[in-house]
Amino acid sequence: MKNITKAFETIDQYFSPKIITEINDQYVKIAKIKGNDIPWHNHENEDELFFIIEGNLLMELENEPMFTMQKNDLFVVKKV
């Protein structure tokens, strides 16, 4: 069993994802994000799931309107 609050306490750098478990050959990672620290990128082989624990995140997707995710929001970015 994993405690996400305790796992976050071990992260001391922003946008430095940490693997907390694995399921069906996929990693479950957590990260602290501040400001615009996420570099633009895409995933060709896997989807990416975002779940907001605290705060909010401005989500920008190619050819889509921007939107803001807030606490307890979940969103999946499909692979390209």
Regions found by a protein language model. Give the residues of each.
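A short, N-terminal "cap"/entry segment at the start of jelly-roll beta-barrel domains
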Residues: 1-31, 40
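Short, surface-exposed charged micro-motifs
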Residues: 19, 49, 58, 66, ...
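A cytosolic small-molecule/anion-sensing beta-strand core signal
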Residues: 24, 53-54, 70-71
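Structural motif
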Residues: 27, 37, 56-58, 74
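Short, conserved beta-strand element in jelly-roll/cupin
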Residues: 32-33, 43-59
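Short beta-turn/strand-loop junction motif enriched in small, turn-promoting residues
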Residues: 35-38, 80
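Short acidic-glycine-tyrosine-enriched beta hairpin
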Residues: 63-80
